[in-house]
Amino acid sequence: GGYGGLCKTINCLCDFGEYHIYDMEPASRLQEKYLSNFKIDGKVFHHSEPEELKDIDLLISNYAYSELGEKLQDLYYNNVIVNSKKVYMILNRGQVSREVFLKRAEKDFEVTVEKVLDFWPPNGHLYYTTLIRK
């Protein structure tokens, strides 16, 4: 989500047919306004709820998943993450929340976790997490 900068950057680097952004409605309006200033080759979809998508090539989540409540995490995992071939995530919540997610993901994905930074109190660490569908 954010302001739409990742969508614009990916559009400059590669072709895509569809790009789906999950975010709150006010953020979606900002993204639409920002992206309207550029020629985006693929179709951009904005979702405020984790609607089910199938056959996702790549999912990128920079902090968003770890900032959702448990109910939304469940919906997002079951409707979006599990239907992705590859997932790249930055997780920034405490160890318990991260471990719950990783244990869940291990049944569906090959999981790689790399600790990047040791500076984020009270969470302690910042992690890059890569998932590849089994």
Put a short name on every predicted segment.
Residues 3-15:
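Conserved SAM-binding loop of SAM-dependent methyltransferases across substrates and taxa
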Residues 12-19, 84:
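Conserved S-adenosyl-L-methionine
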Residues 24-27:
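Conserved SAM/SAH-binding beta-strand->alpha-helix loop
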Residues 32-54:
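S-adenosyl-L-methionine
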Residues 57-71:
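A short SAM/SAH-binding and catalytic strip from SAM-dependent methyltransferases
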Residues 68-80:
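A short, conserved alpha-helix within the catalytic core of class I
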Residues 84-95:
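Conserved beta-strand signature within the Rossmann-like core of class I S-adenosyl-L-methionine
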Residues 114-134:
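Core SAM-dependent methyltransferase catalytic element
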